[in-house]
Regions:
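A short helix->beta-strand "capping" segment at the edge of beta-propeller domains
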Residues: 2-23, 57
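A short beta-strand motif characteristic of beta-propeller blades
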Residues: 14-18, 57-63, 100-105, 141-146, ...
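WD40/WD-repeat beta-propeller blade N-cap
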Residues: 18-25, 62-70, 106-112, 147-153, ...
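Residue-level detector of Asp-centered blade-edge/turn motifs that repeat once per structural unit
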Residues: 32-33, 77-78, 119-120, 160-161, ...
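Short coil/turn segments within WD40 beta-propeller repeats
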Residues: 43-47, 88-92, 110, 130-133, ...
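Short loop/turn segments that connect beta-strands within beta-propeller blades
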Residues: 51-54, 96-99, 137-140, 178-181, ...
Length: 365
């Protein structure tokens, strides 16, 4: 790993603000420009929050509780649009600065639990059973419907640099080329099913968390993937660091049951990847994410703890505030705020400490 380490006291967080939604927080995400936090709930609420310099959250309601879960959120690359999908089978898109609903795409009552904006253009991909549709914001039309065929879609992820769309499900991952949607997708086969998928920040690796308790890392353009085994259950969550080690490779964190493993590329190709475990959580880890530009890893679990791991190795701090457990988390794009959602409707935000003082709802290790 890179020897240039950040001072620990600069990485600790202090309680910043809290708000409450009426039910389980299903997703939380920041706009790419860092000005807005979006959150949604199992009651169907969709809200925007401006994080003020003072300790408060200013919530703007885009959608009130409907009784049907809102499950996924994504901001467009220019931060102008927010998309949400959920149990009612609709994909709704709002203009962020005005809160205006600009599109309401009916998905024929198929639960929409995965959606993502392209980081390269104003295209929105979303799941609809065994299919993925790609909606073009410029023309307000569904550009293409892709047939995964072998099962319902379990995850989808755009390549960060080029117009590739990876889609996972039974028997692996299919990668479509957005320059020509009619071209047959590339297929990355697994004997079981692939759930969570994640491209590394530069797009050279695709991580695949599988239902047979394995993790596969594909180096794009190399047809010999690395297979990691020994997980206690299915690999539920993946997170790449945008900081790289001395080999120029990012770290990959993988959550399975109550444990987290961190994988680092080894200089010896025959070894492939080294790993180590992070074990503090007592219940299922629901979300993991690296702070931008560092190896500081945050993990949120059903045990009511958000843990911060220094250099993705050493427990640095435990954040609390959701007694029924944490369901999701997201770092601000510049890393100075961490937002997390709770199973009881809590929305908590922590901010970087000034000299490591005033920690609010936290424990220092």
């Amino acid at each position: 790993m890179d020897n240039k380490k950040t001072n620990k006291s600069e990485l600790t967080l202090q309680f910043h603000a809290k708000a409450m939604l009426s039910d389980y927080v299903t997703a939380v995400t920041w706009s790419p420009d860092g000005t807005t936090l979006a959150v949604c709930s199992a009651a169907g609420e969709v809200m925007l929050a401006a994080v003020a310099a003072v300790n408060e959250l200013s919530l703007q309601t885009l959608q009130t509780a409907t009784g049907k879960s809102a499950d996924c959120l994504s901001f467009s690359r220019d931060s102008q649009f927010l998309a949400a999908g959920g149990q009612d089978g609709k994909v709704r898109i709002w203009r962020v600065n005005s809160g205006e609903l600009i599109a309401d795409l009916d998905n024929q009552r198929v639960w929409v639990d995965k959606l993502a904006w392209s980081p390269n253009c104003n295209q929105l991909a979303f799941s609809m059973g065994r299919y993925v549709q790609v909606w073009n914001a410029e023309d307000n039309v569904v550009e293409v419907t892709l047939n995964f065929d072998s099962s319902s879609i379990l995850d989808l992820a755009w390549h960060p640099m080029v117009q590739y769309l990876a889609v996972s499900g039974y028997q692996g991952v299919k990668v479509w080329h957005g320059e020509d949607w009619d071209e047959d997708p590339e297929i990355l086969s697994v004997p079981s099913a692939t759930g969570a998928i994640a491209w590394s920040p530069q797009g050279e690796y695709l991580g695949c968390g599988n239902m047979d308790n394995t993790l596969i890392v594909n180096e794009w353009g190399n047809f010999e993937p690395w297979v990691m085994q020994g997980f206690p259950g299915k690999v539920r969550e993946l997170a790449w660091s945008d900081k790289t080690n001395s080999l120029g490779a990012p770290l990959l964190a993988a959550a399975s049951s109550e444990g987290i493993s961190v994988w680092e590329k080894h200089a010896d190709e025959s070894i492939g990847w080294d790993s180590w475990g992070l074990e503090v959580h007592e219940k299922v880890v629901n979300a993991i994410a690296f702070q931008p530009s560092t190896f500081l890893l945050a993990s949120a679990a059903a045990d009511g703890q958000v843990c911060l791991w220094y250099e993705a190795e050493q427990l640095l701090q435990i954040l609390e505030g959701a007694e029924g457990g944490f369901s999701c988390l997201a770092w601000h794009p510049e890393g100075q705020f961490l937002a997390a959602g709770g199973c009881g409707g809590e929305l908590l935000v922590w901010s970087q400490s000034m000299g490591g003082k005033d920690f609010g709802l936290s424990k220092l290790l």
